[in-house]
Amino acid sequence: MAIAPIRIVGDPVLHTPTAPVQVAADGSLPANLNGLISTMYDTMDAAHGVGLAANQIGYGLRVFVYDCAEDCRQTARRRGVVINPILETSEIPETMPDPDTDNEGCLSVPGESFPIGRAQWARVTGLDADGNPVTTEGTGLFARMLQHETGHLDGFLYLDYLIGRHARSAKRAIKSRHWGVPGLSWMPGEVPDPFGP
């Protein structure tokens, strides 16, 4: 098992768009990609996350892994990887997000959560770990995760989309925790679960 430190908001790799994974003419993927994917799964599992983008552990590649239910009330989860994802969504609501139903967290903003409006439905197309075409879609929590992870790969954190008092609360939290600077990370399994009880 290989667990990597998770970068915290302020690290440049989180705020830079990732590069597509290069696919060879024969359709094969880079030989070292399976090792990265394995580390991503191990890290996500150790952190109790529902998704993890490669740049969250310092790799500027367009890859994310997930282990996520359709919604918070379900125990059945879907697990997978998407390489070079392209996101499609339904319309994003223009109303103020509901703090009771629209809260979102991020492993790169450990222990914090803020309400954010997201599309109710999302789909990503890309490649699986073997280089085969893959499409995955969902609603609710699963759609939120797809939007969140592809946002990471585009160089954005969910904090970048917060509005009003929620954006101000996030700025205060970052300042009080002394985040927002390069080089900060946390190690899943070595510190208490930041989203746990």
UniProtKB/Swiss-Prot annotation:
GO annotation, biological process? co-translational protein modification; translation
The cofactor note reads: Binds 1 Fe(2+) ion.
SUPFAM superfamilies named in the record? Peptide deformylase (SSF56420)
Cofactor(s) needed, names only, are: Fe(2+)
| Listed Pfam families | Pep_deformylase (PF01327)
* NCBIfam families, per the entry: pept_deformyl (TIGR00079), PRK00150.1-3 (NF001159), PRK12846.1-4 (NF009483)
Q: What is this protein called?
A: Peptide deformylase
Name its species: Mycobacterium leprae (strain TN)
